């Protein structure tokens, strides 16, 4: 199965309202054809990065469960949505724009796709909290395990394949 089909199937499996609108937007705005701006710089790199981030996030969560068996697992739909859509705004060609996590979350909202507060924080702050210490949501984001997992998986994916195709 191609990455595109895996991503679409996984997003559909979340059974979230308006997920078809999000998928249609992804297809019509080249999510599956574009490269990332800083890593995965090749046609289809954005989709590859999204899928790798998702796979790494699942691995991180499994490792967390192994180390801390009494801690509840993250919601699988939330993990899929945040890992696969954290760079959603890149499909519109908006590269090198500061605040792309915020833009991604807002674009999803504009499409009528509801994000929980934790999902919003995970997408909004997936890059880092380093430059956001004074942001009113920074403490909530800092405490979000979902945000931490997406951030770490995104960072690992970007560093694993910087400039090369998988």
Which sequence ranges carry the predicted segments?
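Metal-dependent phosphohydrolase cores
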Residues: 1-166
